[in-house]
Amino acid sequence: MVEPEIPQNTGNIARTCAITGAKLHLVHPLGFDISEKAVKRSGLDYWDKLDIEEHDSIGAFLEKYKPEENNMFFATTKGKTKYTDINYSNMYEVFVLYGKETKGLPEWLLKKYLNTKTIRIPMLPTLRSLNLSNSVAIITYEILRQHHFEDLQETSTYLDK
């Protein structure tokens, strides 16, 4: 997540990452303090199960995880490829970057990778975008589906406890 602004979205995304085993990368500056009650409440009691890494800036993130050397995609309403048209099944590690709720990803980043690494979720042309946490969940579960939900429990035993 690049410069997220809404604490509840980040909490929901943290919960999705924790329950799926995905690593959450937070790129600063954040629009809130990560210890805020709204963030913690949205993530429930999953915070101690979350693999999280924070980065000082988008530049610091891209320097560490180079797009050309990694399976990296940029989720945007301006994307050229549907997220379902990517074959993730042969990718061991996948990075999907999402921008801030009000502006999305930086324009310079989209211009650089628009034709090669941008993905989008199809939607009606008359509306702006889905909620960020919903978008993260949709794309995360497509990647997991293509990996046959590896390491995830497909039937519930929660009620048996």
Which residues make up each language-model segment?
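Post-transcriptional modification and biogenesis factors for structured RNAs
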Residues: M1-K161
